[in-house]
């Protein structure tokens, strides 16, 4: 219903798996390209968020181009959520400021001092909030789509890393194309998943092989 079409077998299986998980954990969805893994992941994420109290999602992709391509679909999904609560969205990669759809949203940016009660802001309930535009606060927005390195950096010992952990701790984390990552990236992914496990964060891994 959220996407305007009935779920196929893969999407139905993902939703059933999300509904039957006893506790936050890792849901692995392996299927060939073109079967609707993205919609399956978002539908499962919505179920997991409702069941385990998450307040948003992080969608990690391997490249800036794939993140840009998926951004309009994620925005549409976010805008079709059933309640009218205001939410923030963030495109998190180094060239985000060149994305036309993201630039359009920035023209409707919510100032830091705004309490979201401005009638003029009610038409667009998913917005780019000014406070989340900084690189350190990027993962604190409700809906974050970006390159997977935004997640991998949570495995590093670096300044302000606790803000990444804080942003991820309240979300459902989706990692796409995980079959394409090399051994070097997988070491950081393993460590990041270990942290997410301690935080009881539901994780969805998407793979084509």
What spans do the regions from the language model cover?
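N-terminal helicase ATP-binding lobe
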Residues: 1-209
């Amino acid at each position: 219903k959220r996407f305007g079409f009935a779920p196929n077998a893969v999407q139905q299986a993902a939703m059933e798996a999300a509904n039957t998980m006893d506790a936050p954990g890792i849901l692995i969805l392996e299927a060939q390209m073109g079967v609707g893994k993205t919609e399956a992941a978002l539908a499962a994420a919505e179920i997991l968020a409702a069941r385990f109290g998450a307040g948003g999602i992080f969608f990690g992709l391997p490249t800036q181009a794939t993140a840009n391509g998926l951004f309009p679909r994620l925005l549409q999904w976010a805008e079709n959520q059933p309640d009218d609560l205001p939410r923030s969205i963030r495109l998190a990669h180094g060239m985000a400021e060149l994305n036309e759809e993201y630039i359009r949203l920035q023209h409707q940016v919510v100032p830091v001092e705004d309490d979201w009660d401005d009638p003029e802001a009610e038409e667009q309930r998913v917005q780019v909030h000014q406070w989340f535009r900084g690189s350190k606060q990027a993962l604190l927005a409700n809906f974050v789509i970006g390159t997977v390195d935004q997640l991998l950096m949570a495995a590093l010992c670096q300044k302000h890393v606790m803000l990444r952990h804080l942003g991820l701790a309240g979300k459902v984390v989706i990692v796409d194309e995980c079959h394409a990552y090399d051994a070097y990236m997988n070491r950081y992914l393993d460590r990041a998943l270990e942290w997410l496990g301690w935080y009881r964060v539901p994780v969805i891994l998407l793979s084509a092989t």
